[in-house]
């Protein structure tokens, strides 16, 4: 119960925080219990997170966090303004960490999630960015608090999605997967007009 209350539950809560520092703290707690939690507690913790054990601890955690991201994306599709009060970047970062640690990665599911995030945020990141406005346009450029929040949500999500995409590509390197990964990175680099997000998706 101590592990759940002070480590796992806290990580679960922080991973959806809108602030990058809070989500990062949640990720560090995930790394702690992923590596240090004794096997006898795995099933108990997975049930508390709404998941179930599927034999492998890392894959079970991936399944739980992938399900959570799917639910977050469903919510954002219904009302992006409401969903942007939290964040998905922490959940995506958790998936990238777990994918890197896993023996096998559910590539199709990860690819679908990456595409869903891109579909969600691309209208905001591909629009003309205020920081790129010409001097004479500055008076016409105004961002409401809601649009600022959505933009922040979007570029943070895109940063972590790029990292997840890279991990997935490296986990199963074939000529086709490398080409697909390159094509998607190129699409992002050619489409994104928001300076912060553009710098984040450039592959390492």
Predicted regions and their residues:
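Charged, low-complexity, helix-prone segments enriched in Lys/Glu/Asp/Gln
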Residues: 37, 65-69, 73, 84, ...
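Alpha-solenoid HEAT/Armadillo repeat architecture
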Residues: 16, 81, 100, 170, ...
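Extended HEAT/HEAT-like alpha-solenoid repeat tracts in very large eukaryotic scaffold/adaptor proteins
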Residues: 22-30, 79-98, 113, 138-169, ...
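Alpha-solenoid helical repeat scaffolds
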Residues: 35-40, 101, 171
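Amphipathic alpha-helical segments within extended alpha-helical solenoids and repeat-rich scaffolds
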Residues: 2-18, 47-77, 106-143, 176-193
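Short, flexible/disordered intra-domain loops and linkers
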Residues: 42-46
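Long alpha-helical scaffold regions
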Residues: 3, 22-25, 38
């Amino acid at each position: 119960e101590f592990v759940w209350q002070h480590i796992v539950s806290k990580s679960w809560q922080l991973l959806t925080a809108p602030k990058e520092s809070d989500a990062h703290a949640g990720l560090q707690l995930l790394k702690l219990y992923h590596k240090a939690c004794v096997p006898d507690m795995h099933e108990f913790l997975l049930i508390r997170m709404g998941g179930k054990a599927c034999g492998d601890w890392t894959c079970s955690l991936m399944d739980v966090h992938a399900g959570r991201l799917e639910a977050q994306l469903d919510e954002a599709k219904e009302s992006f303004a409401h969903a942007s009060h939290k964040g998905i970047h922490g959940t995506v970062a958790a998936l990238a960490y777990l994918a890197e640690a896993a023996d096998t990665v559910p590539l199709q599911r990860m690819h679908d999630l990456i595409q869903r995030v891109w579909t969600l945020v691309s209208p905001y990141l591909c629009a003309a960015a205020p920081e790129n406005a010409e001097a004479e346009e500055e008076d016409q450029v105004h961002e409401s608090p809601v649009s600022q929040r959505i933009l922040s949500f979007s570029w943070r999500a895109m940063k972590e999605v790029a990292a997840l995409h890279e991990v997935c590509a490296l986990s199963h390197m074939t000529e086709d997967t490398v080409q697909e990964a390159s094509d998607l990175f190129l699409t992002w680099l050619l489409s994104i007009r928001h300076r912060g997000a553009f710098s984040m998706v450039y592959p390492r």
